[in-house]
Regions:
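Extended, alpha-helix-rich binding/interface surfaces that flank or overlap catalytic cores
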Residues: 352-353
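N-terminal and secondary-structure boundary signal
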Residues: 1-318, 322, 328-333, 337-343, ...
Length: 383
């Protein structure tokens, strides 16, 4: 792309269908409109955030009306719309139904594409991985439109456009990738490689009703009133992260992207259209309890023990836990042991702080709890 990468910010206060459609058109206008990306006959894949089957008011999934508006714009430009993902929990059809998206699929005649077939895909030169097994179905289209939801994330601080593409990893392989990648910095490297491999042509962020606190599955809905759009998932994340009060160096995905020198990772490479960053910024946005600004750039034999003490770990609340066993099943290191009467124990000596358990818990019974050193640092205001 020649010149700065556009990121469009538009106010959208609710999910009134006509209002969402108009706001989306305004967001796409600085990008040349949907017609600049789509020619008649193009097959277009929508990749929303379909983490779990929760109703729209819970702000867990991309809202049905954002999917409707994007679909109508694509159809008006002559494209055929498909919708696909590999949910973290439950079947795609179940999540579409419980999230209210199935109604839009039926109304507009969208074609549903479950991500079922893992295939090795080469990562572009400059990645950490040579190839990654991703859903083969995601590579059968002329254009991918990434439709993330604005949410917090216990491991990655925020889940926006780049993180949403982790949904192209098929089902049960997700925990194994968490194990392979490990901490948030290495997970960020994996996410960047997936982003560069999948290469969505358009990214539209649903930030009308976002999620703050202990996201991405059990945080609190927060009215943000924002739609954002960009051809670059990375540039979109850079701008929106700043709006939420998270400096790029404190966001693992953005920090690693700057170190790699990826396009869209630096403010001077980006031009914001629509709302000014000052007008779009969100006051007092609540970040995950696991969030910390502590830098452990020390030798491993020193930083390891410090990092464990200054990290957060999952806590299973026995008053909420139903002992369904989902957390045990998704933990990549088998660190969780459930109690018969509710709740459970996490073996901190092997826990890798991926928070897959918290992400997948259908009851919201798991939350991050700070280690002893982190509690002190937070009390002192330095973490």
């Amino acid at each position: 792309m020649i010149g700065p990468i556009p990121v469009s910010l538009v106010r959208c206060l609710n999910y009134d269908p006509d209002g969402v459609r108009q706001s989306l058109r305004e967001a796409l206008d600085p990008l040349g409109g949907m017609g600049a990306l789509i020619s008649p006959g193009h097959k277009v894949l929508l990749k929303p955030n379909l983490l779990q089957g929760k109703p729209p008011e819970k702000a867990v999934t991309t809202h049905p009306e954002v999917i409707r508006a994007a679909s109508l714009e694509i159809m008006e430009a002559g494209g055929t719309v498909f919708i696909g993902d590999s949910p973290g929990s439950g079947s795609l059809s179940s999540v579409l139904s419980k999230s209210g998206i199935a109604g839009v699929v039926e109304d507009l005649g969208l074609k549903v594409v479950p991500f079922r077939t893992p295939v090795p895909v080469s990562v572009p030169v400059g990645g950490v991985y040579h190839s990654i097994e991703l859903a083969g179905e995601a590579f059968e289209f002329d254009l991918i439109v990434n439709l993330p939801k604005l949410k917090t994330h216990a491991q990655m601080v925020l889940t926006l456009a780049v993180k949403n593409l982790f949904g192209t990893v098929v089902g049960a392989a997700k925990p194994s990738w968490h194990l392979k990648a490990g901490d948030s910095d290495h997970m960020a490297e994996l996410l960047l490689d997936i982003y560069r491999t999948v290469a969505p042509g358009l990214n539209i962020l649903d930030g009308v009703l976002g999620m703050e606190g202990n996201g991405p599955g059990s945080g609190a809905p927060r009215e943000v009133g924002l739609l954002a759009a960009s051809p670059s998932a990375l540039a979109l994340d850079l701008v929106v992260s700043s709006l939420l009060g998270v400096d790029a160096k404190e966001n693992p995905v953005l920090r690693r992207s700057m170190e790699r020198g990826l396009p869209g990772s630096m403010p001077e490479q980006v031009k914001v259209f629509g709302l000014s960053p000052e007008d779009a910024s969100v006051d007092d946005f609540i970040l995950p309890a696991s969030y910390t600004r502590v830098d452990f750039s020390l030798p491993d034999f020193i930083s390891g023990p410090l990092k464990r003490s200054a990290s957060s770990y999952p806590f299973l609340d026995p008053s909420i836990c139903t002992t369904c066993g989902i957390c045990e099943g998704v933990c990549p290191v088998s660190a969780i042991s459930l109690f018969d009467d509710g709740g459970g124990d996490v073996d901190k000596s092997i826990c890798i702080n991926c928070f897959c358990c918290q992400e997948m818990c259908p009851e919201g019974a798991i939350r991050p709890v700070a280690g002893s050193l982190l509690k002190i640092l937070k009390r002192l205001g330095v973490a």
